[in-house]
Amino acid sequence: MVVNDTIADMLTRIRNANLARHQIVQVPATKMTCNMATVLKEEGFVQNFEQMGEGIETHLMISLKYNGKNRQPVITALKRISKPGLRVYANHKELPRVLGGLGIALISTSRGVMTDRQARHDGLGGEILCYIW
Protein backbone atom coordinates (compact mmCIF):
# COMPACT_ATOMS: atom_id res chain seq x y z
CA MET A 1 0.00 0.00 0.00
CA VAL A 2 1.37 3.41 -0.98
CA VAL A 3 1.12 6.05 1.74
CA ASN A 4 1.84 9.72 1.04
CA ASP A 5 2.18 10.81 4.66
CA THR A 6 4.21 8.16 6.51
CA ILE A 7 4.28 10.21 9.72
CA ALA A 8 0.48 10.48 9.92
CA ASP A 9 0.24 6.77 9.07
CA MET A 10 2.63 5.90 11.92
CA LEU A 11 0.73 8.07 14.42
CA THR A 12 -2.62 6.58 13.34
CA ARG A 13 -1.34 3.02 13.67
CA ILE A 14 0.03 3.74 17.17
CA ARG A 15 -3.23 5.47 18.18
CA ASN A 16 -5.37 2.54 16.94
CA ALA A 17 -3.14 -0.07 18.58
CA ASN A 18 -3.29 1.88 21.87
CA LEU A 19 -7.09 2.00 21.76
CA ALA A 20 -7.23 -1.75 21.07
CA ARG A 21 -4.63 -2.36 23.84
CA HIS A 22 -2.29 -4.19 21.45
CA GLN A 23 1.21 -4.94 22.71
CA ILE A 24 2.98 -4.54 19.36
CA VAL A 25 2.27 -2.38 16.31
CA GLN A 26 3.84 -2.75 12.86
CA VAL A 27 4.81 0.45 11.01
CA PRO A 28 6.50 0.84 7.60
CA ALA A 29 10.14 1.78 8.18
CA THR A 30 11.55 5.01 6.78
CA LYS A 31 14.39 7.17 8.09
CA MET A 32 11.81 9.53 9.62
CA THR A 33 9.73 6.82 11.35
CA CYS A 34 12.92 5.21 12.73
CA ASN A 35 14.09 8.56 14.11
CA MET A 36 10.66 9.25 15.62
CA ALA A 37 10.57 5.79 17.23
CA THR A 38 14.02 6.42 18.72
CA VAL A 39 12.84 9.67 20.33
CA LEU A 40 9.64 7.99 21.61
CA LYS A 41 11.74 5.27 23.25
CA GLU A 42 14.15 7.80 24.81
CA GLU A 43 11.21 9.78 26.22
CA GLY A 44 9.56 6.64 27.65
CA PHE A 45 6.44 6.58 25.48
CA VAL A 46 7.21 3.14 23.96
CA GLN A 47 9.01 0.15 25.46
CA ASN A 48 11.14 -0.83 22.50
CA PHE A 49 11.25 -1.10 18.72
CA GLU A 50 13.16 -3.14 16.18
CA GLN A 51 13.56 -3.05 12.43
CA MET A 52 12.45 -6.18 10.56
CA GLY A 53 12.64 -7.25 6.92
CA GLU A 54 14.83 -6.17 4.03
CA GLY A 55 14.66 -3.67 1.20
CA ILE A 56 11.21 -2.36 0.38
CA GLU A 57 9.57 -4.77 2.85
CA THR A 58 11.27 -3.17 5.89
CA HIS A 59 9.03 -2.33 8.83
CA LEU A 60 9.31 -1.37 12.50
CA MET A 61 7.84 -3.49 15.27
CA ILE A 62 7.05 -1.04 18.08
CA SER A 63 6.28 -2.39 21.58
CA LEU A 64 3.75 -0.12 23.25
CA LYS A 65 3.89 0.75 26.94
CA TYR A 66 1.02 0.44 29.44
CA ASN A 67 0.74 1.38 33.13
CA GLY A 68 -0.93 -0.35 36.07
CA LYS A 69 -3.33 -3.26 36.42
CA ASN A 70 -5.86 -1.70 34.07
CA ARG A 71 -3.18 -1.35 31.37
CA GLN A 72 -3.66 2.37 30.79
CA PRO A 73 -1.69 3.48 27.72
CA VAL A 74 1.31 5.73 28.41
CA ILE A 75 0.46 7.64 25.22
CA THR A 76 -2.79 9.49 25.89
CA ALA A 77 -3.01 11.24 22.53
CA LEU A 78 -1.05 11.97 19.35
CA LYS A 79 -1.70 14.94 17.08
CA ARG A 80 -0.14 15.61 13.67
CA ILE A 81 0.77 19.30 13.29
CA SER A 82 2.78 19.87 10.11
CA LYS A 83 1.03 18.18 7.18
CA PRO A 84 2.06 17.79 3.53
CA GLY A 85 -0.48 20.44 2.53
CA LEU A 86 0.44 22.90 5.29
CA ARG A 87 3.92 22.75 6.75
CA VAL A 88 4.42 24.35 10.18
CA TYR A 89 7.84 25.72 11.13
CA ALA A 90 9.06 27.50 14.26
CA ASN A 91 12.35 28.94 15.46
CA HIS A 92 13.68 27.99 18.90
CA LYS A 93 11.92 30.95 20.57
CA GLU A 94 8.52 30.00 19.10
CA LEU A 95 8.62 26.26 19.87
CA PRO A 96 5.40 25.22 21.66
CA ARG A 97 5.15 23.64 25.09
CA VAL A 98 2.72 20.71 25.03
CA LEU A 99 0.40 20.67 28.07
CA GLY A 100 2.76 22.95 29.98
CA GLY A 101 5.66 20.53 29.57
CA LEU A 102 3.81 17.28 30.32
CA GLY A 103 3.80 16.23 26.67
CA ILE A 104 6.35 16.56 23.90
CA ALA A 105 6.46 18.05 20.44
CA LEU A 106 8.60 16.20 17.91
CA ILE A 107 10.66 18.67 15.87
CA SER A 108 12.55 17.88 12.67
CA THR A 109 15.71 20.01 12.81
CA SER A 110 18.93 20.21 10.83
CA ARG A 111 20.42 17.84 13.45
CA GLY A 112 17.64 15.25 13.18
CA VAL A 113 14.37 14.59 14.97
CA MET A 114 14.27 15.72 18.61
CA THR A 115 11.87 16.90 21.30
CA ASP A 116 10.89 20.52 21.75
CA ARG A 117 12.89 20.67 25.00
CA GLN A 118 16.07 19.43 23.33
CA ALA A 119 15.63 21.78 20.36
CA ARG A 120 15.03 24.74 22.69
CA HIS A 121 18.14 23.79 24.70
CA ASP A 122 20.26 23.52 21.53
CA GLY A 123 18.83 26.75 20.10
CA LEU A 124 17.39 25.00 17.04
CA GLY A 125 14.13 25.52 15.20
CA GLY A 126 12.51 23.34 12.58
CA GLU A 127 9.36 21.65 11.39
CA ILE A 128 6.86 20.75 14.12
CA LEU A 129 5.91 17.17 13.25
CA CYS A 130 3.46 16.23 16.02
CA TYR A 131 2.40 16.55 19.65
CA ILE A 132 2.41 13.52 21.96
CA TRP A 133 1.08 13.44 25.51
UniProtKB/Swiss-Prot annotation:
Highest taxon above the source species: Eukaryota
InterPro entries: Ribosomal_uS8 (IPR000630), Ribosomal_uS8_CS (IPR047863), Ribosomal_uS8_sf (IPR035987)
Localization annotation: Plastid, Chloroplast
PROSITE patterns: RIBOSOMAL_S8 (PS00053)
Keyword annotations from UniProtKB, A to Z: Chloroplast, Plastid, Ribonucleoprotein, Ribosomal protein, RNA-binding, rRNA-binding
Pfam families membership: Ribosomal_S8 (PF00410)
UniProt GO MF annotations: rRNA binding; structural constituent of ribosome
Cellular component, GO annotation: chloroplast; ribonucleoprotein complex; ribosome
Keyword Ribonucleoprotein set for record: yes
Record's function text: One of the primary rRNA binding proteins, it binds directly to 16S rRNA central domain where it helps coordinate assembly of the platform of the 30S subunit.
Subunit-structure text: Part of the 30S ribosomal subunit.
Family under the similarity heading: Belongs to the universal ribosomal protein uS8 family.
Family matches, as NCBIfam families: PRK00136.1
Name of this protein: Small ribosomal subunit protein uS8c
